[in-house]
Amino acid sequence: MAPGTSTGSLDQLFDDLGHPNPYVQTEAFLEMVRHHADASLPRLLLMLDHQDVVRRRAAVRALGVFADRAMLPLAAKFHASSDATVRASCVKAYAQIASNRPGIDVPPEAMAALEAALHDDSPVVAISAVMALGQVGRQALPLLLQVCRGKNEAQAVAAVTALAGSDHPDVTACFLELSTAETTDPYVLETVISSLARVADLRMRQA
């Protein structure tokens, strides 16, 4: 499709985001990012407010392929919204970006939005933030370690799980600390012990 495609054709691509077949959705948003990125991005951000779950989830997936272009607009959308569903969708879009582009440099504004999401009143937003930070990887390590040591058990379990495959020395030190602390929540402790065993097994295989 040529870059000069009409608005009508772009409207058709947005209609395709509501298609029940994920393949049709994927083809639509890949076409958007290739040929209509500037026109599509604002409309995709608006779709995060959509009541139709299929379209909203498709918008999250679509924003994931916009990578750097979507980072700052998503942060602005997150901070501006009073709707927990919209905020969760912004966070999930960050997870999609990080999953699609491993090692991508996340700007300070986006990291600040994810950190704010950790303290969101909505449990869905808060847990989604941990999962997104897990996708971000090493850049998010300090935040994830804070969450592991935090008082929110559900978030701590999610953070430990996100870091379970890491053999970074700071992660190992945190897990060892949690495994011996009397105040560690039983569910967190169980996850930590399992993760330490996984790291030990990984090191044995690599030896």
Language model region names:
Residues S9, V54, V106-M111, A154:
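HEAT/HEAT-like alpha-solenoid repeats
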Residues L10-D11, Q25-T26, L41, M71-L72, ...:
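Residue-level signal for cytosolic alpha-helical hairpin/rod architecture
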Residues M1-S6, Y23-A37, L46, R56-R69, ...:
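Structural detector for internal amphipathic alpha-helices that build alpha-solenoid repeat scaffolds
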Residues Q12-F14, R43-L45, L74-A75, A113-E115, ...:
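Buried hydrophobic core positions in alpha-solenoid tandem helical repeats
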Residues P20-N21, Q51-D52, S82-D83, D121-S122, ...:
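Short inter-helical turns and helix N-cap capping residues of alpha-solenoid HEAT/ARM repeat scaffolds
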